[in-house]
């Protein structure tokens, strides 16, 4: 049965608080609150990633996707992100195209669209994904996303599975017993082709959710199957980097975890680099290659986003939120907030409340 909307509202109004609910290696890996505003500070020279069509969605594939979409619809009574019975699994419904991107910070995950389509932006990278493709986030990333295909009759319906680095590492040794080749580039966000087997595994996982015992005992086995099938796709070697010790993605992921723990403190790039035993220059280069943001830009995004969350959901005033997230100067905070979100803090939050903002929208 669907998770009650009241429960969904409860979890979405609390997820995303930095420094809370650390469940993986002392790091808060939960999705942060989203923002229905496009950041105004954009690196120049956007890079649009395209993946040529490879999988036909006619016939059996279309029927399989319709079956998956119907299951997702069963667990999404209204727009929003809903947790399933198995930890780290979510389903998403959005019943209209968005005129402005939604802003969020997401954990490592694979995102599968059963219906509809989205554009996702991280730094200079712009990616599109739909039922023919999957989206993978390799590290915690500040992203903005926009629904480009959805309607009330045919909403965007998606599935999200968190990717635990330790479990990815274990399964990688089974999929690649002789070792996995190192990909030519390491990015924190990328798309790849979906497969019939992947869609079938996700469908069977959702079917298990109807029975609590099935979900508890059989669900983890199907989750492993989903990750194995993902590792066996063309983007498998890139996915494997999530769990590879000392890989570029893994080390940046550890640094991101450290930054999220210390986001409100005045830290330097040298201190961030030292946390993962790298030189400052190598760390800066690798961090930006993976996240499309410099380490200090990443920290600023976390500060501004957490300030917005505190003002909206905990009713803090701008001055209190400013100091809580590490700003010493309210005027600097107001300047950077306005530049990032396009409006002064108090005015911006008031407008969001007037628009009836009720859920985090942290779904990708």
Task: Place the predicted regions along the sequence by residue.
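Terminal helix-turn-helix DNA-binding modules in bacterial transcription factors
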Residues: 257-273, 278, 288-331, 343, ...
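A short, N-terminal "cap"/entry segment at the start of jelly-roll beta-barrel domains
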Residues: 25-85, 90-92, 99-100, 182-186, ...
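Short, positively charged and aromatic/hydrophobic N-terminal segments
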Residues: 7-14, 27-28, 50
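N-terminal regulatory/effector-sensing and dimerization cores
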Residues: 81-179
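Short hydrophobic/aromatic patch on the recognition helix
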Residues: 132, 283, 287, 332-337
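Short, Lys/Arg-enriched, Trp-marked, Pro/Gly-tolerant hinge/linker segments that flank
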Residues: 180-196, 206-276, 289-294, 300-301
């Amino acid at each position: 049965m669907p998770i009650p909307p009241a429960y969904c509202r409860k979890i979405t109004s609390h997820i995303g608080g930095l420094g809370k609910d650390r469940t993986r290696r002392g790091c808060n890996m939960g999705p942060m609150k989203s923002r229905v505003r496009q950041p105004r500070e954009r690196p120049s020279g956007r890079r649009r990633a395209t993946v040529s069509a490879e999988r036909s969605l006619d016939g059996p594939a279309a029927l399989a996707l319709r079956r998956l979409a119907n299951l997702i619809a069963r667990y999404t009574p209204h727009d929003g992100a809903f947790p399933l019975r198995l930890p780290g699994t979510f389903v998403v419904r959005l019943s209209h195209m968005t005129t402005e991107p939604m802003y969020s910070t997401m954990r490592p995950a694979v995102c599968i669209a059963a219906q509809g389509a989205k554009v996702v932006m991280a730094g200079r990278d712009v990616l599109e994904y739909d039922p023919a493709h999957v989206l993978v986030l390799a590290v915690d990333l500040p992203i903005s996303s926009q629904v480009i295909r959805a309607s009330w009759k045919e909403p965007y319906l998606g599935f999200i599975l968190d990717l635990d680095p330790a479990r990815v590492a274990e399964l990688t040794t089974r999929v690649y017993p002789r070792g996995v080749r190192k990909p030519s580039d390491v990015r924190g966000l990328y798309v790849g082709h979906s497969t019939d087997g992947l869609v079938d595994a996700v469908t069977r996982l959702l079917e298990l959710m109807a029975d609590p015992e099935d979900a508890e005992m059989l669900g983890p086995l199907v989750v492993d199957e989903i990750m194995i099938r993902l590792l066996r796709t063309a983007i498998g070697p890139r996915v494997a980097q999530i769990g590879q010790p000392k890989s570029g993605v893994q080390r940046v992921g550890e640094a991101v975890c450290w930054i999220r723990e210390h986001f409100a403190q005045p830290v330097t790039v040298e201190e961030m680099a030292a946390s993962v035993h790298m030189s400052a220059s190598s760390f800066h280069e690798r961090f930006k290659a993976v996240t499309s943001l410099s380490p200090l830009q990443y920290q600023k995004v976390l500060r501004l986003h957490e300030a917005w969350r505190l003002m909206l959901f905990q009713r803090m005033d701008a001055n209190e939120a400013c100091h809580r997230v590490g700003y010493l100067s309210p005027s600097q905070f107001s300047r950077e907030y306005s530049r990032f979100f396009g409006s002064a803090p108090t005015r911006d939050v008031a407008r969001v409340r007037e628009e009836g903002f009720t859920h985090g929208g942290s779904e990708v």
